[in-house]
Design a protein with these regions (language model features):
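Short, flexible turn/loop "capping" segments at secondary-structure junctions
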Residues: 2-5
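Amphipathic, hydrophobic secondary-structure cores in small proteins
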Residues: 8-11, 17, 21, 25-60
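A structure-centric signal for secondary-structure junctions around beta-strands
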Residues: 7-8, 66
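C-terminal structural segments of small proteins and small subunits
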Residues: 55-86
Length: 86
């Protein structure tokens, strides 16, 4: 039996804790196993809280509180989205 391929891990960073909480709730409602956590040291964020998730990122989720979205690739992070409203 083949095991399913692992989900891609994304990290979303935010300007505010409220933004992180709102994004987390949105992903949970979509069925993702999203987790709020401290931002990894390699990344920087205004509020220090990020959301780790596995669904493919949809640009429609972006609002003024979203700072950036990264794809976690082995030992590094690749920028997928950066909010131009910052």
């Amino acid at each position: 039996m083949n095991s399913p391929s692992p989900s891609k891990e994304h990290i979303a960073t935010f300007h505010t804790h409220f933004g992180a909480l709102t994004f987390h709730k949105k992903l949970k409602a979509l069925g993702d196993n999203a987790v709020m956590m401290p931002v990894p040291r390699k990344l920087s964020a205004s509020c220090g809280t990020c959301v780790k998730f596995s669904l493919p990122f949809d640009h429609a989720w972006a609002d003024e509180d979203l700072e950036a979205v990264y794809l976690h690739e082995e030992r590094d992070y690749r920028l997928l989205f950066e909010n131009e409203e910052t």
